[in-house]
Amino acid sequence: MLNQFSRTQLLLGAEAMEKLKGARVAVFGIGGVGGYVCEGLVRSGVGAFDLVDDAQVCLTNLNRQIIATRKTVGKYKVDVMRERMLEINPDCDVRVHKCFYLPETAAEFNFSDYDYVVDAVDTVTAKVTLVLEAQKAGVPIISCMGAGNKLDPSRFRVADIYKTQGCPLARVMRTALRKRGVKKLKVVYSDEIPTRPIKDMSISCRSHCICPPGAKHKCTERRDIPGSTAFVPSVAGLIIAGEVVKDLSRA
């Protein structure tokens, strides 16, 4: 029967579409990468989601985040993403969690509820904890490495974390995961050498923070503010969505 996912079903088949419909995916980090992960998955027929992020849409998100418009500035990212996903597929189930994932909040999540976990967060501590919790629960996880300070979207690769090269974040993650006995981890990374951002305090969030009132993570509290584009994190997010769809449909 013709439906909104018919074009996808022509490639994946009816059985795969049923698997996607019955799957629950947790996406941690609904930003430049995570937003496009959600977009790709909901348009592919995944039936249930948990969205995790405590941030609000900021004016500086408009250059790259699919949820960011002038009208959504100041709104919680998970709420905006949920509304968008339900407009695409009203039948999907989307739960939102307005929290910043850290070891202290890990107990709030039951990873055995998920069929797949997507790590699209920025901090190493959070990323490592996500990997440990997902693997402990036996749930597949894919982790995004650095997408900031990059200009060439064609340089993204899918690989095991221990086979990555050229990505500073991946290097830090390799060390941290090796210390904790993690043997493997599927990641999306770019082998492009990062571009050093221009030091211009007149356009720096560090000196002109315009985060929405009540935002928990101010730019002035961050060590570095990376440069970004519309066409790099979006590609990383869609590659991740493709990997999740492929793995779930073959499970």
Task: Describe each PLM feature range.
Residues 27-29, 52:
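Conserved N-terminal Rossmann-fold NAD(P)-binding element of oxidoreductases
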Residues 120-121, 144:
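Short, well-ordered coil/turn residues at beta-beta hairpins
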Residues 46, 51-89:
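Glycine-rich phosphate-binding loop and adjoining beta1-alpha1-beta2 segment
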Residues 1-26:
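N-terminal charged helix/coil linker that caps or initiates catalytic domains
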